[in-house]
Regions:
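Acidic catalytic motifs of isoprenoid enzymes
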Residues: 1-190, 197, 201-239, 244-258, ...
Length: 289
């Protein structure tokens, strides 16, 4: 369940940059308040996107406050007190916990085995709390894991079939961010399904050599591609096609807030994640001095 969606910094306006950073700090502080300091390191940029999408589709204007950032002494401007931010914090905890289960202990190096053991010990309480707060979301992740096991046992050669579990869970996850409008929910489910398929293919392509060496199921290995470079090129080609499909559904959304920021993330940011638009764009500093 990996894969990050973040803005494409070279094309981001200062206003949108500030909005994004305030949401990032807001989600991190929500995780700190609800689940403890250690849980904050689970935050990935997907959670920030979930919060922005949820609030923007519903037209919820967040409260902006200057509060202390977890792990820092200084106070920064951040967004708070919205349903989208609370949903994002819950999602990051549950998704982070299930990511810990993705690889077997036997496949990890000793240092990573120790790190996983510490994570599972210290994050257990946060996971249990998030699961109780949002049992429906926990069921989504559990179903995805069960479907993934079935696909591994089948050793499916069909790319769409192999990506189906992750595509389904992302589709269901994104549909929860929509309002009660059935058309909006349908569009968000399709967008999430495309994103899940994109990140599944890219993740499997990057793990081509490791999975082949460890005898783990990998759809690119089953299709006998000639090395990791060929797998990555194949994954990028399929992912770009999924991005084009996603764009048609995304353009149908009625965004009430943050439309330019979301356009940057969903169009340029996603394309950059699939096929880098500019060298070293990811090494840009996020915090303006």
């Amino acid at each position: 369940m990996k894969g990050r969606m973040r803005p494409y910094l070279p094309e981001l306006t200062i206003r949108d940059y500030n909005t994004y950073m305030r949401y990032l700090r807001g989600v991190r502080r929500q995780m700190y308040k609800s689940y403890g300091f250690y849980a904050c390191h689970l935050l990935r940029t997907n959670g920030v996107l979930f919060a922005i999408l949820s609030d923007s589709l519903a037209g919820r204007m967040p409260t902006r406050k200057r509060q202390r950032v977890p792990g820092m002494l200084c106070r920064r401007s951040m967004m708070c007190q919205t349903l989208g931010i609370r949903q994002a914090a819950q999602t990051e905890i549950l998704m982070g916990w299930h990511n810990l289960q993705d690889r077997k202990y036997s496949e990890l190096r000793p240092a990573k085995r120790v790190r996983r053991a510490v994570d599972k010990l210290l994050l257990r309480r946060a996971y249990d709390k998030a699961r109780q707060e949002n049992p429906a979301l926990e069921r989504l992740f559990a179903q995805e894991r069960e479907q993934a096991v079935v696909q591994m046992n089948l050793s499916a050669k069909n790319y769409a079939l192999a990506a189906e579990p992750m595509s389904n869970v992302y589709g269901a996850l994104y549909s929860t961010l929509a309002t009660d409008d059935p058309n909006q929910r349908k569009s968000m489910r399709y967008i999430g399904s495309c994103i899940g398929r994109i990140f599944y293919l890219l993740d499997k392509a990057e793990r081509f050599e490791a999975d082949r060496r460890n005898g783990q199921y990998n759809v690119f290995v089953v299709n006998e591609l000639n090395g990791q470079a060929a797998a990555i090129e194949n994954a990028r080609r399929q992912a770009l096609a999924a991005v084009n499909d996603l764009m048609r559904a995304y353009k149908m959304l009625d965004l009430k807030l943050n439309d330019t920021l979301l356009n940057n993330i969903m169009i340029l940011g996603l394309q950059h994640a699939v096929y880098p638009l500019e060298q070293d764009a990811d090494t840009e500093k996020w915090e303006i001095p």
